[in-house]
């Protein structure tokens, strides 16, 4: 019996060690070697077939090709290369000049986009116009259309450029790329709308293939069917920069990772003549000065570049525009790259003349697809747990006879994308059915912002939101600020939608430290802090994406303490408890959050506060702010505005006074050029302001501002004390504004109302 047990134990031990992670059997190793041998045999077979195709060809490009005999198949292969892909347009223009008919187009990355456009019937002029008119800085963001965001998103979430999430299993989830690519995808859908109902790329006016990489296996995938916009998106999704494109539970990235110059694909499709355009850069060299981006680029393109060197030698006509030194992400001067493509192709004009066939060229051009409205009778939704068909129908644009243009479909998709819990959305049309595929934010959404303001210093703000969807949508949020003036707040915002009408309810409780900066003769002489415990209840209505009105009630316990500088400013050394209420209306129709050129921003608020701690202080009043922006031209815009406020009461708490100065507005602070942050305190004030803005680029702006102020204060010893309208103060200055991935950066120089020296201010990020 013991012998049998020993033998059985020995068998199970042998079985375990044969198939465990650490010990692998001889048979397992041999099987793996055989698998690799089979893969190499397939590669050899592929190369042999290419060799046979080349050996069959007897075409001499130095002589006129006879198109009346056996019609040679001409393929155009366009390599990847980012912004340098504009050179492809110049090559196409020269091919059209010589009326060279193209039968096959194969492209990788940007080559797949330019090639795809030509394959559906765009002319080189149309391609150039489309590319030159693209707003690349807008495409290279995750921003949703601000006009479509709800008012709560505009007020709060616009301030957080960084996002991540914690899933339902409490695993921290970082983005798979810097950008989710949604805006690029929507642009591609717009470009390829004329091919919306073409699913087989052999049926396009010119047979077409795009190259992408299966991220799971690292293998090359040749795209011959599907949605053309998705195909080109898969082909150009640069690893780490753009999130991989998910399709049928697989993830795809830039085809340049495996095959940046797919001449072999053209050969496999039976091409007799291959015209290939190479815009690839010289292979980057790793040295001590290399950075993370260089290393990632090297790793992600190693195999693709290795193939490129071989494939170059397989082209019948290799055209190499002089663009190798142009940066792949530099989208300036694209028209110059187009010219370089023309120059490079024109060198071989004598060859292209031999490939000319006006008859075949005309037949090719006559097949060009045109944009047409699409009949949509059915709607399908995939990937949704929260979004409903009812909501999708509510967002549907109004059209006649269910005929949707490309703009209608893109606007519909943008509206779905603008919903706060939607992270990605794509669509395709099959016959009379539109299918929306969505990716929703689930679990805990974490947002972050890094900020800096002159005098205030640096800060990091984080918000974590747990959404709860039902009859009432509830967002439970924790907000925190790490800075010299820390804050933490817990709140719940709930809303119930009735069509476009929304009922809002909120509750919050928090502790915050706010600074009180005190200046005299232009110098900061003291800093006090307000340590505040605050809780509020609110109820409001949003009648559109731009307007919200409501009422709030709350309790506050304020304890002001000295922090630094002059200790003798007793006015701010106070402690009080109060209950307060306010009525408010907020309107926001701005086209941009940071540097708007169009729209209105309006804030009206009436307030009341009553001390309950025995200090017998009370106050009531109101405040307003209104700014209006109008474009004067494509680059120039003008903004005008007014602001003001008045409070009255007994024993007014000095820390409740209006705070004037700095470049940004906040809850009780009003910007004024010519004063630093909190440069003046007032119980009544009025500001008139105006400014000019010039857009140098999509992200860089020149700013000029002027404002006038009159104010009164309650006998504060460190500042002028005049009655309202007794004096008028004038501030003016100029600077730059830069939209960055961290948020806006402002550098501004102005006069200083309290000093003969200029006032220099720097702001980065947002004000909370």
Region roles according to the model:
Residues 21-108, 116-414, 418-430, 441:
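Patatin-like phospholipase
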Residues 445-450, 581-697, 702-708:
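C-terminal outer-membrane beta-barrel translocator/porin domains of Gram-negative envelope proteins
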Residues 16-20:
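Sec/Tat signal peptide C-region and signal peptidase I cleavage site
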Residues 289, 517-519, 558-565, 616, ...:
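Outer-membrane beta-barrel and related beta-rich outer-membrane complex signature
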Residues 407, 426-583, 590, 661-670, ...:
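Gram-negative/organellar outer-membrane beta-barrel architecture
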Residues 212-215, 321, 383-385, 438-442, ...:
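Flexible glycine-/small-residue-rich
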Residues 5-14:
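Sec-dependent N-terminal signal peptides
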